[in-house]
Amino acid sequence: MSAAAPAGARGGGRLLVDGPAGALEVQVDCPAAARTGVAVVGHPHPLYGGSLDNKVAHILARAAGDLDLPAVRFNFRGVGRSEGAFDRGRGEADDMAAVAAWARARFPGPLLLAGFSFGAWVAWRLHPALAPRALALVAPPVSLYDFGRPAEAACPWLVVQGGDDEVVDAAAVRAWAEARDPAPALAWLEGAGHFFHGRLNAVRAAVREAWREALA
C-alpha cells in the first residue's frame, strides 16, 4: 500500500506558480487521502482553444484521481492567466518542466506524465529529462510535429488514439507507435474522434489501468 502524501501538500485549487516566462496558472486536484506522487497533464494547442480546462486534460486528471494520486493541470504560456506568449513548443517544454519541478516539490514520489494532442508532443520531447514513472500520450500529432527526438521511450508508456480522428492521422500514429522499441501499450478506440466525444470514459480507463500497473 502506498504511503500518503505529506499533510502540508494536501488540498488543491487554482494557483499561480513561477515559470520561465512569468507566472503559470495551475489547477491542483488532490484527493483527501492522496498517495505519494503526482500526475502532470499538458493540454492541446494554445492557439486553437487548448487550455487546462479542456475535457480530455480533465479526464486525464480524473484518471490520476481514481488512483488517489494528485494531478496538476496547467496552462501553457499565453493561455488563461499564464504569462508569456506562444513559443512553438520550445517555451512550452520549459513550462512543463517548471510545473513538473514545482509539482514534485509539493508532492514527492513518482511522477506520471500525460499530454493530449499538442501537449502529448511536449510531453514526448521532455520525458527523458523528467524521468517519469510512466507516460501517457493521447492523440499524439505525429504527422504534424517532429516526434523523432527522442527516438525511443525512456519509461513504460501508453498511447490512446481514436480511429476516426479528424485532426491527427490515426494510421500514422499506429505506425509510429508500433515502430518504437519498446512499443507502447496502444489503446485504439475505434470510431472515436480527436476529442473523444462519448468515449472519454474509455480514455480514462485506459490511462488509469496503465498507471495502476506502473505504480504497482
Predicted feature locations:
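Serine-hydrolase catalytic machinery in alpha/beta-hydrolase-like enzymes
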Residues: 19, 23-106
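Active-site nucleophile loop of the alpha/beta-hydrolase fold
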Residues: 44-45, 137-146, 162, 192
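Primarily recognizes the serine-hydrolase "nucleophile elbow" in alpha/beta-hydrolase
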Residues: 94-155
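Short beta-strand/loop motif that positions the catalytic acidic residue
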Residues: 153, 158-161, 165
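Acidic catalytic loop of the alpha/beta-hydrolase fold
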Residues: 163-168, 194-195
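Short alpha-helix in the alpha/beta-hydrolase fold that links the catalytic acid
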Residues: 169-178
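Catalytic histidine neighborhood in serine/cysteine hydrolases
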Residues: 179-195
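Catalytic histidine-centered segment of alpha/beta-hydrolase-like enzymes
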Residues: 192-204
